[in-house]
């Protein structure tokens, strides 16, 4: 039986089953169950009798778990590792000594999460995969109002659903959550889930481009980027975007202060050259964070987000900046005025057509009395859309669910690393780590979001021969999986230096880039069977992300880190 627990004004309210206008001195509570589309919608309404403040909302539903069922767990934000799990697995906590540096990247500060054997957790949606490959699916229809945390209790065969409304105050009737629970085939379920949220994206060919980050990182200047632009024009004239990433500004947070030692002409000349070469210009912004050396931090400290003790909130740690960086309070009026001017400068005055918005999670680290974390995130992105109406938005480092239908593109995995794995960050158990292995796992797991809720950004492929420690087999797999799972695919290479083998792989990308994944089946951990369509024909692919040979039905074996398409 469904059980509901609501903690309001420090009073614990519990009831079982479906309820209509269940009365309590604090108000009326209704849990509705409405049949729809091979399942039902479960929603909770509250009509308060006075001003109320939530501490907790939990709904627990029984689930028919079979031993062979795999459980999909969606990570907290873009970079958070996401995949299907065996029931014997669990998601471990970040190591204690890493928490001062990394805890705010993900969900490590959510105390209600059980991180031990017998429990798994997911955000926004989750599902089990049955032996017949059909899914039992549970997805939020109200993620713009509050984050939804799903916690599986394997032994009890229960799914505990936490609604992130802690500290939220209400005085008028409100729908606390709305969930769609259904069974069926993957492709149809995700189509219906999008339709139930009122999201309909028109077909769009894959968007391509070049970004400065994965070759130069912050070591960019006008000369390097003009040379890269010239090379791109000579080798990939049909690309859409040329995107300037981190490193053009003097400090994170000071978007006005272009580093004139690197860019003596500012960005004006470079942007003009990009446009003259028939590319659209993109720019990187991290609008809701700043580093200590920035003017913003030093002179506008009242804009910074503060915790309950009045201390500035650390959003993370970046050794290539000033170490710890800090979250900004979006609702500071002076900050909003500043951000509006920054957006106008880059999009209207400078003519940038793509805004890569990074570290978005930082805007919603803490709820407010009048806003949940999700509502804060939606307000912030709506603000950017309002003040940059002509620009396409690429979100990165962002909780995904509230951005469905709001942004044009969204990163669906971690940053690609110049090695296969970042062993130190993996040892820290950082699920948001820079990692090629983790990135590929997540982009396959989240393939179903593409062209339904936004266009997927799987991150870059790397085909160059220098400045990385990837094998050619690994490079090939990165390119193939990005091609199949993404709708915005960039690279950072000096393409004129491609080897003959790299050129062949690049031609493969051009040939297959408008493919569409129908399903991904986890054969075993890090070994996948992919069914996809291209030009109305069906194809299969196998991706082996392990260091071992694997057996295939039509081939004798597949090599470590190899992806085969047939």
Region annotations inferred by a language model:
Residues 1-191:
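N-terminal accessory beta-strand-rich subdomains and adjacent acidic, glycine-rich linkers
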Residues 44, 171, 210, 242, ...:
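Conserved, mostly hydrophobic/aromatic
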Residues 206-210, 215-344, 348, 352-354, ...:
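Aromatic-lined carbohydrate-binding/catalytic grooves of carbohydrate-active enzymes
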Residues 216-220, 249-253, 288-293, 362-366, ...:
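Flexible loop/turn segments at secondary-structure boundaries
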Residues 267-274, 373-391:
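Alpha-helix-loop-beta-strand connector modules within alpha/beta enzyme cores
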Residues 297-337, 382-496:
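Glycan-recognition surfaces
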Residues 478, 482-485, 490, 521-563:
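Carbohydrate-binding surface patches
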Residues 479-522:
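Aromatic- and carboxylate-lined catalytic core of secreted/periplasmic carbohydrate-active enzymes
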């Amino acid at each position: 039986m469904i059980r509901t627990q609501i903690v309001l004004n420090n009073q614990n309210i519990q009831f079982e089953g479906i309820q209509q206008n269940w009365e309590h001195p604090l108000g009326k509570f209704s849990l509705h169950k409405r049949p729809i589309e091979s399942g039902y919608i479960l929603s909770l309404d509250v009509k308060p009798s006075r001003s109320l403040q939530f501490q907790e909302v939990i709904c627990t539903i029984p689930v028919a778990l079979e031993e062979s069922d795999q459980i999909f767990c969606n990570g907290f934000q873009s970079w958070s590792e996401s995949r299907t799990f065996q029931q014997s697995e669990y998601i471990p906590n970040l190591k204690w000594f890493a928490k001062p540096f990394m805890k705010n990247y993900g969900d490590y500060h959510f105390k209600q999460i059980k991180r031990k054997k017998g429990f798994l957790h997911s955000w926004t949606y989750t599902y089990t995969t049955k032996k017949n490959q059909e899914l039992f699916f549970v997805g939020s229809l109200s993620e713009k109002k509050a984050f939804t945390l799903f916690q599986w209790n394997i032994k009890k065969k229960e799914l505990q659903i936490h609604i992130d409304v802690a500290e939220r105050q209400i005085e008028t009737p409100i729908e606390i959550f709305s969930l769609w629970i259904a069974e069926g085939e993957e492709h149809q379920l995700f189509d219906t889930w999008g339709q139930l949220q009122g999201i309909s994206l028109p077909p769009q060919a894959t968007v391509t481009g070049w970004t400065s980050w994965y070759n130069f990182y912050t070591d960019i200047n006008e000369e390097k980027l003009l040379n890269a632009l010239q090379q791109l024009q000579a080798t990939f004239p049909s690309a859409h975007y040329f995107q300037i990433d981190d490193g053009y500004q003097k400090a994170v947070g000071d978007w006005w202060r272009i580093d004139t030692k690197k860019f003596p002409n500012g960005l004006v000349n470079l942007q003009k050259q990009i446009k003259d070469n028939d590319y659209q210009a993109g720019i990187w912004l991290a609008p809701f964070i700043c580093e200590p050396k920035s003017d913003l931090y030093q002179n506008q400290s009242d804009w910074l987000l503060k915790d309950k003790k009045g201390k500035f909130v650390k959003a993370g740690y970046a050794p290539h900046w000033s170490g710890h960086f800090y979250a900004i309070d979006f609702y500071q009026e002076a900050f909003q005025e500043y951000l509006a001017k920054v957006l106008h400068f880059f999009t209207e005055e400078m003519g940038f057509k793509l805004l890569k918005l990074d570290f978005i999670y930082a805007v919603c680290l803490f709820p407010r009395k009048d806003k949940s974390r999700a509502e804060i995130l939606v307000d912030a992105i709506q603000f950017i859309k309002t003040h940059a109406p002509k620009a396409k938005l690429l979100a990165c480092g962002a909780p995904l669910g509230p951005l469905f239908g709001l942004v044009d593109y969204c990163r669906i995995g971690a940053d690609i690393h110049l090695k296969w794995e970042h062993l130190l960050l993996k040892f820290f158990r950082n699920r948001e780590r820079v990692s090629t292995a983790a990135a590929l796992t997540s982009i396959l797991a989240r393939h179903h979001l593409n062209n339904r809720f936004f266009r997927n950004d799987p991150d870059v492929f790397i085909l160059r021969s220098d400045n990385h420690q990837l094998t050619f087999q690994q490079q090939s797999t990165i390119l193939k999986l990005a091609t199949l799972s993404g709708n915005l695919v960039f690279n950072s290479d000096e393409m004129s230096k491609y080897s003959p083998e790299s050129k062949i792989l690049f031609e493969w990308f051009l040939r297959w880039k408008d493919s569409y994944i129908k399903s991904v089946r986890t054969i075993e951990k890090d070994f996948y069977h992919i069914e996809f369509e291209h030009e109305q024909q069906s194809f299969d692919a196998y991706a082996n992300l392990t260091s071992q040979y694997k057996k295939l039905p039509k081939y004798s074996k597949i090599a470590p880190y190899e992806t085969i398409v047939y």
